[in-house]
Amino acid sequence: MAITSTHTDEKWSELFQKPYVQILNGKAVRFSDVMVHSFPMGDVEDPDLYAGQPLWEWQESEAGAWVVEHAHDKPYWVRRTDFYNYGFRYYVFARLTESDQVYWQLRWGNK
């Protein structure tokens, strides 16, 4: 699976890595993290196991395949407790260039 997880219960400010600038082909390119997908998960015994199917479906969709292809590092997912719905909410983050962020936002955006 191309999407990994290294974060679980941090604060929102700790989920995003700091933006940075890197020189690629003689041009300065800015990279930053973007939330590219989210979905709810009910109160199940092993939510990470059940989250595999929606993560895989999104990864195989047009938007997910584009993000996996254009992400600078592997996209990663985060599980957060959803107190309003008595379950969990999963978020997928990807590190993209500014131009890729604009393209992604115009094409798919956060729905």
What are the roles of these predicted feature ranges?
Residues Y76-K111:
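Short, compact, well-ordered microdomains
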Residues A2-N85:
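Structured alpha/beta or helical-core interaction and ligand-binding surfaces enriched in interleaved
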